[in-house]
């Protein structure tokens, strides 16, 4: 049985065991090495093709484990484990994340191993693309399956390093166990540096490039830069250095505020801020994709999509921190440009309500929407039992009020009634939809310039260069919030302000949960939703990492060590 599973592992988890298995035709290794220019385009398209399937679970395991979204209720779908933190090794979405990632690594590695460098700038560039994809995938793997870098990286395990098809794949195959977190990071760095060296041709954001490698290196080194309280200044400086290369290249520019509010609608070719994305096109995006793709869970657009996940109350509160964003169609006012990616589903009759979040018990919060009447300065609302309440103004201009409800004072807003899914108002998320105005078409963003400024801001702060950090932080903040820049930044507030801006800016790009834990912070999800609202997930929790898929362990030709199954197995130092 183990022999059968080993062959299955070779064929599935490490696809491309020989070149005939690669997409786009059957080509022998001899044909490719003798005339690489005739075949490389098709072969590399095969590498990029793996990313299209891989990027779906990549998004879900990165975003759903954070605090930017909530779901309408419990679900039998495997992704609910990401939300609930009920980790199991038998999860088909994590299996796809693993399988298609290793397929991409295997195909990229086989091309690297077959083609000699130095034949032409075009061939070297294509080899660089392969190195980029491999390095990027190893990094995405190690942050999902490995502990945060500041936690004993030479002891904790990353992922297996398998660069190409082993010689004896159909014989007595043996592969080494998982490399350490540090070794996996070094593999990613070496690949990305090689990619940076080889790539000299920029084919646009849908393809790997020198800048894409530099952008990813800025993030990798940032992940290695320790916490704000105990920074690793060597890696923080390297994060600055690689961010400088991207920013100073002049090849990318931040979109204007007006255009940034439409960021999701631009194709990669028409977006000056995008550095590398996993390109999707309408012709390959079926009706099925509009429901089961990432955007389909966040919204129903034109009758397409489930629309069962919404912006969390915590994220909405962050958006409203500097002034209320009013989404009502006849009073539309966006204070924070990031609020343009949120679309409440207002009821057609535009019934005025007072909406607030009330505490139902010590551990459960929920939304309330009470019918409201505004008569000059006098505002009242009525609950479902017919009890009337007079509201106290906090800001009449922004229509923010307080209510004394069941002996507790709550703050809320006058708004139109938002349609409910079960008991939750539908704050649809459109950041992963509407590319080219095509319903839920979306090319997942891997790197864009906005992130690079924030990478550099954080790295500067960890180096104690707070003036430089403030400049970068405000570059991003003031793009979204006119006049919203901070006056000062120092050791007392840098971590909180920079992390808050990363949350606002990079929401729904699969970054949030990793950002929280890599800086040693807890994840607090005290907001309405079916998750355990009272549970604070610490950075030391064993559930910070995902389990290695059990099928991968069963099929692995050698020992493949599982992650800890409780906190007693976690190594912190």
Language model: regions and residue ranges:
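Short coil/turn linking the two alpha-helices of tandem helical-hairpin repeats
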Residues: 119, 142-149, 203, 220-232, ...
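"A position-specific structural signal for the A-helix of alpha-solenoid helical repeats
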Residues: 126, 133, 140, 216, ...
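Aromatic-residue-lined binding/catalytic grooves and analogous aromatic/hydrophobic interfacial grooves
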Residues: 18-19, 199, 211-259, 274-275, ...
């Amino acid at each position: 049985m183990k022999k059968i599973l080993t062959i299955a592992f070779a064929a599935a988890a490490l696809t491309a065991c020989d070149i005939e298995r690669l997409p786009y035709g059957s080509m022998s290794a001899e044909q490719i090495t003798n005339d690489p220019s005739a075949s490389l385009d098709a072969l590399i398209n095969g590498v990029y093709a793996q990313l299209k399937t891989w990027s779906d679970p990549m998004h879900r395991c990165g975003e759903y484990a954070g605090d930017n979204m909530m779901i309408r209720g419990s679900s039998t779908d495997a992704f609910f484990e990401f939300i609930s933190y009920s980790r199991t090794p038998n999860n088909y979405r994590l299996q796809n994340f693993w399988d298609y990632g290793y397929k991409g690594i295997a195909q990229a590695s086989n091309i690297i191993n077959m083609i000699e460098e130095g034949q032409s700038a075009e061939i070297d560039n294509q080899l660089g693309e392969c190195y980029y994809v491999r390095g990027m995938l190893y990094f995405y793997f190690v942050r999902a399956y490995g502990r945060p870098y500041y936690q004993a990286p030479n002891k904790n395990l990353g992922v297996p390093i398998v660069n190409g098809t082993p010689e004896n794949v159909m014989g007595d195959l043996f592969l080494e166990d998982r490399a350490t977190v540090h070794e996996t990071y070094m593999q990613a760095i070496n690949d990305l540096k090689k990619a940076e060296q080889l790539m000299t041709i920029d084919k646009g954001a849908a393809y790997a490039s020198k800048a894409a490698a530099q952008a990813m290196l800025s993030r990798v080194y940032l992940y290695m830069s320790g916490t704000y309280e105990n920074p690793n200044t060597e890696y923080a400086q390297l994060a600055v250095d690689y961010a400088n290369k991207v920013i100073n290249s002049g090849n990318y520019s931040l979109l204007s505020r007006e255009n940034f509010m439409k960021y999701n609608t631009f194709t990669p070719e028409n977006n000056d801020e995008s550095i590398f994305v996993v390109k999707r096109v309408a012709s390959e995006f079926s009706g099925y994709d509009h429901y089961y793709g990432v955007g389909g869970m966040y919204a129903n657009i034109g009758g397409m999509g489930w629309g069962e996940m919404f912006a969390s109350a915590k994220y909405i509160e962050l958006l409203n921190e500097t002034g209320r964003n009013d989404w009502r169609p006849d009073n539309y006012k966006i204070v924070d440009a990031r609020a343009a990616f949120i679309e409440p589903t207002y009821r057609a009759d535009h019934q005025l309500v007072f909406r607030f979040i009330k505490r139902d018990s010590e551990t459960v919060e929920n939304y309330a929407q009470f019918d409201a009447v505004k008569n000059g300065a006098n505002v009242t609302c009525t609950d479902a039992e017919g009890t009337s309440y007079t509201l106290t103004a906090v800001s009449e201009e922004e229509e923010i009020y307080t209510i004394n409800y069941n002996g507790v004072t709550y703050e809320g807003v006058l708004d139109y009634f938002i349609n409910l899914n079960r008991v939750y108002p539908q704050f649809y998320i459109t950041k992963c939809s509407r590319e080219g105005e095509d319903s839920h078409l979306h090319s997942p963003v891997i790197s864009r310039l906005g992130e690079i400024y924030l990478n550099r801001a954080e790295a500067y702060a960890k180096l104690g260069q707070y003036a430089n950090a403030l400049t970068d932080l405000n570059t991003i903040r003031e793009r979204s919030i006119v006049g919203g820049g901070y006056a000062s930044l120092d050791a007392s507030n840098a971590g909180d302000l920079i992390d808050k801006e990363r949350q606002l800016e990079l929401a729904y790009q699969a970054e949030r949960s990793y950002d929280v834990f890599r800086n040693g912070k807890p994840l607090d999800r005290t907001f309405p939703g079916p998750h355990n609202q009272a549970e604070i997930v610490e950075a030391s929790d064993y559930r910070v990492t995902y389990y290695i898929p059990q099928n991968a362990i069963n099929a692995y030709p050698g020992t493949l060590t599982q992650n800890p199954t409780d906190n007693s197995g976690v190594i912190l130092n």
